[in-house]
Swiss-Prot record:
Site feature (Cleavage) residues: A658, E659
Signal sequence, renumbered to the chain: 1-23
GO cellular component terms, semicolon-separated: host cell endoplasmic reticulum membrane; host cell Golgi membrane; host cell mitochondrion; host cell surface; membrane; virion membrane
ZnF segments: CCHC-type: 555-575, 580-601
Residue ranges of every copy of the ITAM domain listed in the record: 621-644
Sites carrying sugar chains: N142, N357, N409, N937
Family label: Belongs to the hantavirus envelope glycoprotein family.
Keyword set includes Membrane: yes
Protein's organism: Puumala virus (strain Bank vole/Russia/CG1820/1984)
Regions that span the bilayer: 496-516, 638-658, 1115-1135
Protein name: Envelopment polyprotein
């Protein structure tokens, strides 16, 4: 057994894996969609799921069980008596008996079922108050299998208490997931949040509300009253279909319906609610429901045995119910209640479609559940902008987006958005991760483009790091870190400035000493090289002179070329006697012997050394080397002078490096004032402007004949607005394509009502009375009888988007000019101009991707953007075309289901229908090729019955603008502007720093004139960081200016030209714990007033303001810096003491 234990363990593990695989296959999801704001009295939330089929033998043992934490109502869990009504072929028929109307029979028996949707009176009505949830199921069966549909209804408060739990029905597990949508209180339809308000259609004009198609789930409730016919529901159906004379249908009850995913209960019938009348009429037309079968049975076949009657209950002496017996895929619900009995008699009829035609009087039933659709008026929830912030995390950033009314659309080209949602009250929050911070983070949220500057994230990390380093002095840690952590050259300049101020008295002599040592070594190497080279040149000159006067310098014996006369004389004396002229050792008096000895002789350089000693020794103490050696780098005067020069230099670099680069769109920091233009010629501007950008142009126009006469000129172009005259085509629908085969052996094709005949869109082809044996099963009667009915229909209709057709287009900009005291405004179209006596502003043309006759499709809120269709069918639409299925105010428009039927036959086999046309809806085709369509984004949309206006936030459109100002201006009249402007700073929020931004609130007073168009800037003492154009009116005006930039010492003032408010306000320091973005719409402003760039005086003014700001700010920072300066001076004094005998030590 010990040897077999590993095998047993292996088999056990395999069995567990197989069990887990089977469990996973039996897991189904039931999604409950909840609004994310739950208030009292908002009704019920409902959901359903269709489960896989199970053998009919298991139905009687089914039990719906729950492991959820909510309180389940027990009324549906008890056993209930049903009459099981089935059909079968008669057992006494001979083997080859052909099928006929008498070849089958029905049987009735009593069974007990539990958990079906038999909802007692007041259970649904009190569910919200009692905090009880209702779980039940319904059955759609043929002769062998049943397909359950599980329904879950509960008070909407369960969306708060439950996130996920499990239900079980037989061997099937149902994962119940409560998902909060981005809707505050409405249902999610077409990607938008829709609040159905049925009274709007009665009290308001049609253009003030929207109409949506929503699903309706209805459940039969039994309620008996002692007298009257008020609860006899069948009477209402008979009245609706104008059937008179029926007196036997005494069943009493009503349907309670839930609309969409959450709603208050709707009672059917109810005289005071037109929604109830609409549902009642749909029930009368489609008595079994408007949803015909499950999606996986979209292409299936059924065989009709014939009409049957039976006894319900089984103890009846005569038939009380009728229907159509079939085999094949199950269709509608197989449960119902008999209408002819006072007391409810429940029927379970597998394989039989029970009679539901209300135009007959007898043997009718009502289904226990009914599913359909209803069109309702209502309003679409307003959306708000998103707030996004990010924090640095590892190599990337952690970001979070939230909105007060939900996030319906969020995407980013640089981040991974995982759709993990949280809700705090009405706010919806989504967290996501951005893996890279080497580029700015762009997020599209609720139709707005948000940009987070990643350099601000790095600044935040820098602040955190420096704060940790200086944590021993927490009073100055953050203030010092904020000053140091500035991006780019500006930050390095700040750090060098502080290092120079604090440690300059130590760093300057240290760095100077190191540089001097390097220079001295280099000078010495250069001088040494010069000495050797000069000596070699001297020897060469001596050699040449000797050769000229005395002859050859070559020894005749050893053939060695000598360099001096003494060396040649020694060779002549020694070589001839066989002695070495250098070391005087004996050798042979031959050339080879002597040359071999010279190679090893150690005294060969004796004569060169003697010559070198006879020359004057070189003293490298003159010129550069001597100057460097005697440089007094430890002098207090030198160190102090360099320290002051470096401080001034660093302040200039610090101020100059604070300027931002010029941008096409956005603010460029400039000095105060505006540019002056002498009007010697006409002033002409010709440029291209992005559709999402506004443009401000401001100048002082000067009289060339008199420089004192100046006219203020202000031009303001607002963002481009697209005006589209539209035709509302309706709502585009998606649907499931169904192909059904209905075969019966005898009777004409008109004998039966086929399931697809109650669908909104269908076509049918009948193959009646077969003429051969090739299309008949073996039990059919043969040639000349029977029918194969082929049907194609569309169901499971779902509204997916709004559709508008562009009738005409206009592109406009509002143009305003202020020339002296004259102000003119006009909304200018393409190829239109604003013309005054002196100024002409023209919008010459627009580059656009929109054209009249284009069709716009919105798959969600307008702010989410849409798709442009160049071809959209409006009259003759085929299934699969864009716009194939449309829901319009006049009703449903069905497409042409083009294609031909073909009956597939085989000998002794039931025929099957085939369809060779398109089977994919236009919406599904569009989704598969969505990237091939042009898309567009929308900001600030405004829609009415026949018009749609919006701004393009992507700058995909451009306008050609031309501006001409005539030089013939009336300077005498226009230069004298009586308007007086006084400015005061009210408040400020936000932070200084180029990546954070601030909002300055100004109070501007206008006197002496009624209106004046001008620009108000946000400036400190040196520069301006933002501007806004304001049309001032007489009196007090509140102006908001958004700016970015500045430093810790900036006192932001409200300025007009060179006049500023008397006081300024200091913005907060950029803590940058959570970096928020700026709206791209706020940044798409082009401002050009020609103000001069910051020069030398501006730099000193900026540096001085910063120093004063530091002094007036956290005094502990200044104290610490001064202490460090004193310590560095003391250290310098100790390391570099003054030497009074310096001159004596260096006396020559």
């Amino acid at each position: 057994m010990g040897e077999l234990s590993p095998v047993c363990l292996y088999l056990l593990l395999q069995g567990l894996l197989l069990c887990n695989t089977g469990a996973a296959r039996n897991l189904n999801e039931l999604k409950m969609e909840c609004p994310h704001t739950i208030r009292l009295g908002q009704g019920l939330v409902v959901g359903s799921v269709e489960l896989p089929s199970l053998p009919i033998q298991q139905v009687e043992t089914l039990k719906l069980e729950s492991s959820c934490n909510f309180d389940l109502h027990t009324s549906t869990a008890g056993q209930q008596s049903f009459t099981k009504w089935t059909w079968e072929i008669k057992g006494d028929l001979a083997e080859n008996t052909q099928a006929s109307s008498t070849s089958f029979q029905t049987k009735s028996s009593e069974v007990n079922l539990r958990g079906l949707c038999l909802i007692p009176t007041l259970v649904v009505e009190t569910a919200a108050r009692m905090r009880k949830t209702i779980a039940c199921y319904d059955l759609s069966c043929n002769q062998t299998v049943c397909q359950p549909t599980v329904y879950l209804m509960g008070p909407i408060q369960t969306c708060i208490t439950t996130k996920s739990c499990l239900l079980s029905l037989g061997d099937q597990r149902i994962q119940v997931n409560y998902e909060k949508t981005y809707c505050v209180s409405g249902d999610l339809v077409e990607g938008i949040c829709f609040n159905p308000i049925h009274t709007m259609a009665l009290s308001q004009p049609s253009h003030t509300y929207d109409i949506m198609t929503m699903m309706v789930r209805c459940f039969l409730v039994i309620k008996k009253v002692t007298s009257g016919d008020s609860m006899k529901i069948e009477k209402n159906f008979e009245t609706l279909v104008q059937k008179n004379g029926c007196t036997a249908n005494n069943f009493q009850g009503y349907y309670i319906c839930l609309i969409g995913s959450s709603s208050e209960p709707l009672y059917v019938p109810a005289l005071d609610d037109y929604r109830s009348a609409e549902v009642l009429s749909r029930m009368a037309f489609a008595p079994h429901g408007e949803d015909h079968d499950i999606e996986k049975n979209a292409v299936s076949a059924m065989r009709i045995a014939g009409k049957v009657t039976g006894k319900v209950p089984s103890t009846e002496s005569s038939d009380t119910v009728q229907g159509i017996a079939f085999s094949g895929s199950p269709l509608y619900t197989s449960t119902g209640v008999l209408t002819s009995k006072d007391d409810p008699v429940y029927i379970w009829a597998p394989g039989i479609i029970m009679e539901g035609n209300h135009s007959i009087c007898e043997k009718k039933t009502l289904p226990l559940t009914w599913t359909g659709f209803i069109s309702l008026p209502g309003e679409i929830e307003k959306t708000t902008q998103c707030t996004v912030f990010c924090t640095l995390a590892g190599p990337g950033a952690d970001c979070e987006a939230y909105s007060e009314t939900g996030i319906f659309n969020i995407s980013s080209p640089t981040c991974l958005i995982n759709r993990v949602q949280r809700f705090r009250g009405s706010e919806q929050q989504i967290k996501f991760v951005c893996q890279r911070v080497d580029m700015d983070i762009t997020v599209y949220c609720n139709g707005m483009k948000k940009v987070i500057l990643t350099k601000t994230l790095v600044i935040g990390q820098c602040i955190y790091t420096f704060t940790s380093i200086f944590s021993l002095i927490p009073g100055v840690a953050h203030s010092l870190a904020v000053e140091l952590c500035v991006p780019g050259l500006h930050g390095w300049a700040t750090m060098l400035l502080l290092l120079t101020f604090c440690f300059g008295w130590v760093l300057i002599p240290t760095i100077t000493m190191i540089l001097l040592k390097i220079l001295i070594a280099f000078a010495y190497l250069c001088s040494k090289y010069n000495t050797d080279s000069k000596f070699r040149i001297l020897i060469e000159k001596v050699k040449r002179e000797y050769q000229k006067t005395m002859g050859s310098m070559v020894c005749e014996v050893c053939q060695y070329e000598c360099e001096t006369a003494k060396e040649l004389e020694s060779h002549r004396k020694s070589c001839s006697i066989g002695s070495c002229p250098y070391c005087l050792n004996p050798s042979e008096a031959t050339t080879s012997a002597l040359q071999a000895h010279f190679k090893v002789c150690k005294l060969r350089s004796r004569f060169q050394e003697n010559l070198r000693k006879s020359l004057t020794v070189y003293e490298p103490m003159q010129g550069c080397y001597r100057t460097l050696s005697l440089f007094r780098y430890r002098s207090r005067f030198f160190v102090g002078l360099v320290w002051c020069v470096l401080l001034v230099h660093h302040l200039i670099v610090w101020a100059a490096s604070a300027e931002t680069q010029n941008l096409n769109a956005g603010w460029t920091d400039t000095a105060h004032g505006s540019r002056i233009i002498p009007m010697k010629t006409d002033l002409e501007l010709d440029f291209s402007l992005q559709s999402s950008a506004s443009y401000t142009y401001r100048r002082q126009l000067q009289n060339p004949a008199n420089e004192q006469e100046k006219i203020p000129f202000h031009l303001q172009l607002s963002k481009q607005v697209i005006h589209a005259e539209i035709q509302h085509l309706g709502h585009w629908m998606d649907a499931t394509f169904n192909l059904k085969t209905a075969f019966h052996c005898y009777g004409s094709c008109e004998k039966y009502a086929y399931p697809w005949q109650t669908a909104g869109c269908f076509i049918e082809k009948d193959y009646e009375y077969e003429t051969g044996w090739g299309c008949n099963p073996p039990d059919c009667p043969g040639v000349g009888t029977g029918c194969t009915a082929c049907g194609v229909y569309l169901d499971k209709l779902k509204s997916v988007g709004k559709v508008f057709k562009i009738v005409s287009l206009r592109y406009t900009r509002k143009v305003c000019i202020q020339l002296g005291t004259e102000q003119t405004c006009k909304t200018v179209d393409s190829n239109d101009c604003l013309i005054t006596t002196s100024v002409k502003v023209c919008l010459i043309g627009t580059i656009s991707k929109f054209q009249p006759s284009d069709t716009l499709l919105f798959l969600g809120p307008l702010q989410q953007g849409g798709l442009i269709f160049k071809q959209w069918c409006t009259t003759t639409c085929q299934f699969g075309d864009p716009g194939d299925i449309m829901s319009t105010p006049t009703g449903m428009k069905c497409p042409e289901l083009n294609g031909s039927f073909r009956k597939k036959c085989a000998f002794a086999t039931t025929p099957v229908c085939q369809f060779d046309g398109n089977t994919i809806s236009g919406y599904k085709r569009m989704i598969a090729t969505k990237d091939s369509f042009q898309s567009f984004n929308v900001t600030e949309p405004h829609i009415s019955t026949s018009a749609l206006e919006w701004i393009d936030p992507d700058s995909s459109l451009r306008d050609h603008i031309n501006v001409i100002v005539s030089r013939d201006l009336s300077f005498q009249d226009l230069s004298e502007t009586p308007c007086q402007i006084d400015l005061a700073t009210a408040s400020i929020d936000g932070a200084w720093g180029s990546g954070v931004g601030f909002n300055l609130v100004c109070t501007v007073s206008l006197t002496e004139c009624s209106a004046f168009l001008t620009s108000i800037k946000a400036c400190d003492a040196a520069m301006c960081y933002g501007s806004t154009t304001a049309n001032l009116v007489r009196g007090q005006n509140t102006i908001h200016i958004v700016g970015k930039g500045g430093h810790s010492g900036s006192k932001f003032m409200c300025c007009h030209d060179t006049k500023c408010s008397s006081t300024g306000l200091v913005a907060a320091a950029p803590h940058l714990d959570r970096v928020t973005p700026y709206n791209q719409a706020d940044s798409d402003k082009i401002f050009d007033d020609g103000a001069p760039e910051c020069g030398m005086s501006c730099w000193f003014k900026k540096s001085g303001e910063w120093i004063l700001g530091v002094l007036n700010g956290n005094w502990m920072v200044v104290a610490v810096l001064v202490v460090l300066l004193i310590l560095s001076i003391l250290l310098f004094t100790l390391c570099c003491p003054r030497r009074p005998s310096y001159r004596k030590e260096h006396k020559p």
